[in-house]
Design a protein with these regions (language model features):
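Conserved phosphate/anionic-ligand binding catalytic regions in large, soluble enzymes, centered on
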Residues: 1, 42-53, 126, 130-133, ...
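Short acidic, low-complexity intrinsically disordered linear motifs used
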Residues: 500-518
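Catalytic alpha/beta core of large soluble enzyme barrels
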Residues: 188-191, 197-261, 271, 323, ...
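Alpha/propeptide regions of enzymes that mature by internal proteolysis
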Residues: 33-37, 41-53, 88-125, 184-187, ...
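Internal maturation/activation junctions in enzymes
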Residues: 131-175, 256-266, 279-323
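Flexible, glycine/charged-enriched surface loops at secondary-structure junctions
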Residues: 62-64, 104-117, 126-138, 254-270, ...
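Short, small-residue-biased leader/transition segments that mark boundaries at the very start
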Residues: 2-7
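A structural-propensity feature for long, helix-poor, extended segments
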Residues: 32-34, 66, 71-109, 237, ...
Length: 518
């Protein structure tokens, strides 16, 4: 939805030239306290973070937070559904933020890695319906050794909050040298987890969203609409689908009264009026035989027509490919640009331990659930066995084959949908690399750096990635888990009442949208 990224998904920069503009630390006077009643709302939690940080930038009284207005853990959330997390996640967040701020002396400035950790702690407190958390991408300077190595060693034990963010070096396409690029590539291979990532830009102030498919200037966010292209039967069918998606996306672009956000967010959003018309099911191969350039032209024409009716600007950038983790599950397609993960695999989904489905599965089907590694006290992971449809393209294609598909779609779908801006949108893709393939993939990425902004890479076997979203399994393991899954009786999972009222959800708030992020 148009604005789900405002509260749940966030791209941010801790590049040195951005962190440098933050004020020097001026600690509050701890001899003088000021009570702050935290409001029971998203805005109330955000205000609590803001007032704490400001007290360390501009001095004044020490903030004493009052959490008495926050609903207790397990209380119903009427608008978004699910259950309230209670005040504890916010309390933990504020304590950790204060710890970082207190570690500085008056007159000192925060370092990029300290700002990065603060954002990660904030993300840990962001719950949607008591279940999901924020997904982050952190862009940092090429010369920042602390950020480059921030996920080295046993970081998940000493700094588990860093698991909330994918970290990427921001590189200027026209300035980066091949020597630096290939040295960085070797570090990525050695990490065993595909980090740090690489984000190529034509402007040092531009960024992206966590899945890297949208090119964003500062104070901008995504507006995504998706098309199922796995079963298109003709060029006419294809163009009719993308025309409808462009119409919907342009309608969403008109919702710019953000209330809580600073006015600059509205000005930037209205100026570019971004849409992101995405395709999923590309791995079926059907759409690759059709004229994507002509379809991108249809997207732009429909966007322009609808924008004129709404009296808004036509979109500066229109076409993209997002990862499609949730929609592909709903539609039964391969995700985005990707082939199916494997013939048999396990798909992981996170769930709050205060949810009825967790209690039921834990009691009757414990083999399907496990504790979430980073938050075992309140979050669990459900493993769902999956089997690809017969005749599917599987992940056993070479990474170069996938990269060439990325390049083709970038050239024939995304570039033709670009009107203006320093960077074009991007194909979001995760490239799985076997041990002997790293040099060839690195060379391809260098030679083709004009054809992508950022790509995610992982060792083919998942490397050191803990509880990855997808994991290969044998046919025997699949059959074993399916036997358990067949016995799951969802009718026994009883909610005493359901106070969910989506009519209370403003049109572009996207509160019912779920973030799938490992």
């Amino acid at each position: 939805s148009a604005a789900s990224d405002v509260y749940k998904r966030q791209g941010y920069s801790v590049q040195k030239h951005h962190v440098e503009v933050l004020p020097e630390i001026r600690k509050p006077n701890k001899e003088r306290g000021r009570r702050w009643l935290v409001a029971d709302s998203i805005e109330g939690w955000a205000d609590a973070v803001k007032v704490l940080v400001k007290s360390y930038f501009f001095g004044g009284s020490k903030i004493e937070f009052d959490f008495s207005d926050i609903r207790p853990k397990g209380a119903r959330l009427v608008t978004s559904g699910g259950k309230a997390p209670g005040p504890q996640p916010l309390k933990e967040c504020l304590i950790k933020l204060e710890g970082i701020l207190d570690s500085k002396e008056d007159g000192q400035k925060l370092r990029p890695i300290e700002v990065h950790d603060m954002v990660c702690h904030i993300a840990d407190a962001v719950l949607a319906g008591g279940i999901r958390r924020a997904a982050l991408i952190s862009l940092f300077s090429a010369s920042d050794d602390e950020m480059i190595s921030c996920k080295s060693g046993a970081w998940w034990e000493t700094n588990p909050q860093r698991g909330r963010a994918n970290n990427s070096v921001s590189l200027m396409r026209h300035k980066v040298s091949k020597d630096y690029f290939m040295d960085l590539w070797k570090r990525i291979e050695a990490s065993g987890a595909g980090e740090p990532g690489i984000y190529l830009s034509n402007d040092k102030d531009w960024g992206t969203n966590p899945c890297c498919e949208i090119a964003l200037r500062p104070f901008q966010f995504c507006n995504l609409t998706e098309v199922n292209v796995s079963n298109v039967v003709s060029q006419e069918d294809y163009e009719a689908r993308v025309r409808a998606a462009s119409f919907i996306g342009t309608l969403q672009a008109g919702y710019t009264n953000f209330h809580y956000l600073r006015p600059i967010w509205q000005r930037t959003t209205e100026k570019d009026a971004l849409v992101g018309i995405s395709m999923t099911g590309i791995g079926s191969g059907a759409v690759l035989k059709l004229d994507m350039k002509a379809a991108a032209k249809v997207v732009k024409e429909e966007n322009k027509r609808t924008a004129e009716l709404l009296k808004i600007n036509p979109a500066a950038r229109t076409t993209t490919v997002k990862p499609a983790g949730t929609t592909s599950l709903t539609l039964g397609t391969s995700s985005g640009i990707h082939a199916w993960h494997n013939e048999y695999y396990i798909r992981r989904v996170r769930v709050g331990k205060n949810e009825s489905i967790y209690a039921h599965l834990k009691q009757y089907h414990p083999e399907l659930v496990e504790d979430e590694y980073f938050r075992p006290h309140d979050t669990a992971v459900i493993g769902i066995p999956q089997k690809s449809p017969e005749g599917s393209i599987l992940r056993n294609e070479s990474p170069i084959q996938l990269l060439e598909r990325v390049k083709k779609v970038q050239q024939e779908w995304i570039k033709p949908g670009h009107r203006s801006g320093s960077n074009a949108h991007n194909v979001s893709a995760t490239i799985s690399i076997r041990e002997h393939e790293w040099p060839a993939v690195g060379e391809w990425m260098w030679e083709n750096r004009e054809h992508y902004n950022g790509l995610s890479v992982l060792p083919y076997d998942g490397g050191t990635y803990i509880q990855a979203p997808f994991e290969d399994c044998t046919e025997e393991k699949y059959d074993e888990l399916m036997e358990s899954l067949k016995d799951v009786d969802l009718s026994k999972i009883v909610e005493v009442d359901d106070n969910t009222d989506l009519s209370g959800e403003v049109a572009c708030a996207g509160g019912a949208c779920e973030v799938v992020m490992a």
